[in-house]
Every structure is written in structure tokens, then in C-alpha cells.
Amino acid sequence: MVKVAVAGGSGSVASEVIDQIVARKRHEVTILEQRPTESPCADKQGIKWIQVDYSDKSSLAQVLRGTDVVLCFFTGLDYMSAVRNSKNLIDASIQAGVKRFAPSEWGSRLNWSIPHYRFKDEIREYLEECNKYTIFQPGLFTNYFGFPYSTTRHLSMSPWLIDFDNRRAITVGAGDFSLCLTTVQDMAFVVAEALEYEGKWPVDGGIRGTQITMAELIRLGEKLRGPMRVESVSLEDLREGQLKSSWCPLLTHPCFPDEHREIISRHIMITFLRSVAQGAWTVSDSWNKLLPDYKYTSAEDYLTQIWMGKP
């Protein structure tokens, strides 16, 4: 049995991972949260929920004593809080004798070009000085391109720049920039497997489902959905903070006020397109090599299952 503490365990990605761990019925999961609310997973057997104060390292270390693995799912919407809470969690984990630590990554390989991800780079530097850790990096979740259809219990869904539902897409230049797509189900499975992996965890914990260019993904969309209206934007305009397209996907998130939703969505899409062009979403296959028997769901298989036969 592995004792796992999940920091920020009420989020949608964390909940997908927790479900996969609990389904194995051989691990003990503790969800750590600052607010007196429960994770969607908290009704499951084998989970306990503890309210913590991330500013109090000594009490946090006491909670973590006896824990084998800490998985962190903090968001970076408040940069200073994310950095402070992450560092305190790392310090408390070391003090408590935690063996393995996974910081709040769960996405891109490079974070500096994505404002709400920048705290992750500071935490990587901090971890290099003081702890053994792995960075789980699945790239972008394939599931997003199935919007509005969901195949998971928890993952928050929004339309994206390649919009299969409305047969339209926005790309950078000719769309020859690569990104990695991995289903959230595959990522959650790999994390659960990693808990039981007896070898050394890699620092670079890439999880590679499908490596694909934006142009190839658009062609897949046209194969499944018919012709798409494709708009190309320039990297130069993106660098100047401009998205010169006739539309922009509107993202939904509990932290996005309705009155600012369009502005926030446009900003996120600009930074996402820039980061794709900079190679931020191409990840390694470290965990693929360590778990060679696991078969990942390809982007084509997943999206065919979602879209084939849809009007």
C-alpha cells in the first residue's frame, strides 16, 4: 500500500487521478485543501479529506508524516500564493520524510511563455535544490477536442482553437508546429502506475500519447467532420498580444468572472498559440519507456470514437 497526499485535490484533473488511484483498492489517499469543501471524489472509500494551512509548515509536516508520495495540483492564477504554498509544501514534505514528490505540472514542457504557468518554473528550480521529484507532463489533453462531448467524470471542458464541433480552426502560420496530445485517462493511469513503480522516478516525466502538428490535427478534424474553416495568424502578431481572427473560443472556469471571460479567453489563446510555436507542448516519452506494456489511446482513435456519425 502507498500512502498518497493530494494537494489541491478538489480540481478536475486531480479528481481524475484520484479516481484511478482509488479504483485499485490498495492505496490510501488523503486530500489536502485550504477551504472547507470536499473533492468530488471524497465520497469514495479509501479517501480522507483534511483542511490544511499551507502557511504553517510545521502543522503541514505533521499531517504529511507517514506519507509516501505527494501529488500537487495547485493553479497559478495567483502567482505569489502558488509559489509560496508550493515551497512550503515541499519543505514540509522533506521534514515529514516523504519519499516522492510531483509538483503541479500536468501539462507543457516549457512554462515561461505561459503567464499562469510561470510559477511552475520557479518551483522546478526550488526542487532541484532540495528534493527528489518527477514532473508529470502529458502535453495537452486530447479530451478538449471532443467538446462538447465528455468521456470523463471530472475534467472541465471548453471549446478550443481547433473546434471540431463548429468545424473551424485557428492556427499559427501553416500549422507545422508540433504538440503532444494525451487523454486525461491515460495520464491518470500512468500516475497510478508510477505509485507502484519500484525503480527510480525520472525527473523529466513526459507522458506521450500522440505527437501531432496543428495541421495534421486539422486534417483529422476534416476527415471526421468535413471541411473546416481555417484561419491563420502570425507569430509576430501573437508576440504583440494580438489575435487577428474572426472568433475566439470562450473558456469556462470557476475563477473566470463572466464579465472578463472573453478577455481572459483571448489572452490564454494568444499565449497558447505562442507556446505551441515555441515547442512548449512537445513532451518526452520517459514514462512510455518505463511502462512499455501500456497502450495509449491515439488522438485519432479517441476523436473518431467521439465524432464519427455526429451531425
What feature does the model see in each segment?
Residues 205, 218-280:
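Terminal hydrophobic/aromatic helix or amphipathic segment near a protein terminus
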Residues 61, 184-192, 296-304:
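Short, amphipathic alpha-helical "lid/cap" segments that border enzyme active or binding sites
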Residues 2-28, 32-45, 55-58, 80, ...:
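Oxidoreductase cofactor-interface core, primarily capturing Rossmann-like NAD(P)-dependent enzymes
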Residues 43, 48-69:
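Conserved Rossmann-fold cofactor-binding substructure of NAD(P)-dependent oxidoreductases
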Residues 65-101, 115-126:
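NAD(P)-cofactor binding segment of oxidoreductase domains
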Residues 284-311:
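Amphipathic terminal alpha-helices
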Residues 71-73, 102-108, 172:
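Short beta-strands and strand-loop turn motifs
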